[in-house]
Design a protein with these regions (language model features):
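Terminal, non-catalytic protein-protein interaction segments that mediate quaternary/complex assembly
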Residues: 1-125
Length: 125
């Protein structure tokens, strides 16, 4: 998932695998899906950030917020996606253990489908 989250890429060549080739065009793009959606800059009072940078900002500055999330199921762009997002949103939160300074990062992945037999080892975060 680093090709989507770290590179904010929608190009299957960045994956270095052929599991998604069927959905890619001749350049390797899967359209306005996955990394493309995460990389779009949005305007916040703290400045312009994409979704990944916003998650990192919030985890650093307000780790107990219930608003730390991403969503890449953008209805406006679905017609330009070669593959509708299967894993379409993430919600993050931080918890603190009682009587301890230990913090735990929790993540909840929402997905509409999961190809367990064909792609489970590629599609997990």
């Amino acid at each position: 998932m680093l090709w989507i989250w770290q590179k904010k890429s929608n190009n299957v060549h960045d994956l270095n695998s052929h599991i998604w080739d069927a959905w890619a065009d001749e350049t390797g793009s899967i359209g306005k899906a996955y990394g493309y959606q995460l990389g779009i800059k949005h305007h916040y009072k703290e400045g312009d950030m994409d979704q990944v940078d916003r998650v990192l900002y919030d985890l650093k500055h307000n780790p107990y917020s219930r608003r730390i999330m991403t969503n890449i199921y953008n209805h406006e762009d679905l017609h330009e996606m070669n593959l509708y997002p299967c894993a379409y949103s993430m919600t993050f939160n931080v918890t603190k253990e009682k009587d301890s300074d230990k913090l735990t990062l929790n993540g909840i992945l929402n997905q509409r489908s999961q190809d367990v037999l064909a792609a489970n080892n590629w599609n997990v975060c």
